[in-house]
Amino acid sequence: MIFKQYLQVTKPGIIFGNLISVIGGFLLASKGSIDYPLFIYTLVGVSLVVASGCVFNNYIDRDIDRKMERTKNRVLVKGLISPAVSLVYATLLGIAGFMLLWFGANPLACWLGVMGFVVYVGVYSLYMKRHSVYGTLIGSLSGAAPPVIGYCAVTGEFDSGAAILLAIFSLWQMPHSYAIAIFRFKDYQAANIPVLPVVKGISVAKNHITLYIIAFAVATLMLSLGGYAGYKYLVVAAAVSVWWLGMALRGYKVADDRIWARKLFGFSIIAITALSVMMSVDFMVPDSHTLLAAVW
């Protein structure tokens, strides 16, 4: 029972989702030549860092979590783990994760983890989430860190491939998060969290969702155009982007925004999982014969 509580406070669903993206970035960079010890160190290291960030987030948000239907039964809200113990737990998880990334992967992977952690805990959770409509935008940067860490654990450098991954996953976070805010509108309103749909209205949020999906679509194609991923990835990326955009556009005519937003959110998970899988298996070695070179 105690183990279950300590597991729940780390938000295992979020950890699992991030692991899929880490694997995508790692295998994309590995290009078929997998260093398995490095793979394990990277996965476990990122998992521990994400777990640490989630525990800190639970600690910081325990006051507003009480006001939201979705979060009112969280471990810290119900007092199943004391706040002091959660801080120690989060700190130990973070130290272990950063050490694994530093010594098991490379310093760059560790520093990327540190930056993602600081943005999520220090900038987003402590301030932006409660005080700015741009909190989601800032938080998207930390959400995009795991695949970049996986990629850079292999390459040891932040190149154009890493930049494209950062763009893809940051842009994906925006419509994904706005969809949550729409179908959980009353929760965010009750907790006085200034997300875009609450502050500017759902109609404005729909416009932003559409624009971000278009930008996401362009970013996903750049992996193939830049010679990092192959044609099969390109086809899947184009297909999921077009379908997701179509779902967003249908949102302008729906009668129930909450049902529409939940479906949009659900497909966002399918889309990013499909891309992570395809970049894992359909990689290319960048050379002069990239799609971008062929275009020019």
UniProtKB/Swiss-Prot annotation:
One of the record's GO molecular function terms: protoheme IX farnesyltransferase activity
InterPro entries noted in UniProt: Protohaem_IX_farnesylTrfase (IPR006369), UbiA_prenyltransferase (IPR000537), UbiA_prenylTrfase_CS (IPR030470), UbiA_sf (IPR044878)
Known EC number: 2.5.1.141
Chain ranges on the Periplasmic side, renumbered to this chain: 29-37, 98-107, 217-228, 288-296
Catalytic activity: heme b + (2E,6E)-farnesyl diphosphate + H2O = Fe(II)-heme o + diphosphate
Major site of localization recorded for this protein: membrane
Subcellular location(s) per record: Cell inner membrane
GO CC annotation terms, alphabetical: plasma membrane
Residues on Cytoplasmic side: 1-9, 57-78, 127-197, 248-268
Protein's membrane topology: Multi-pass membrane protein
Keywords for this protein: Cell inner membrane, Cell membrane, Heme biosynthesis, Membrane, Transferase, Transmembrane, Transmembrane helix
Family: Belongs to the UbiA prenyltransferase family. Protoheme IX farnesyltransferase subfamily.
HAMAP family documented for this protein: CyoE_CtaB (MF_00154)
NCBIfam families per record: cyoE_ctaB, PRK04375.1-1
Record's miscellaneous remark: Carbon 2 of the heme B porphyrin ring is defined according to the Fischer nomenclature.
Its biological purpose: Converts heme B (protoheme IX) to heme O by substitution of the vinyl group on carbon 2 of heme B porphyrin ring with a hydroxyethyl farnesyl side group.
UniProt-recorded name of the protein: Protoheme IX farnesyltransferase
Species: Escherichia coli O1:K1 / APEC
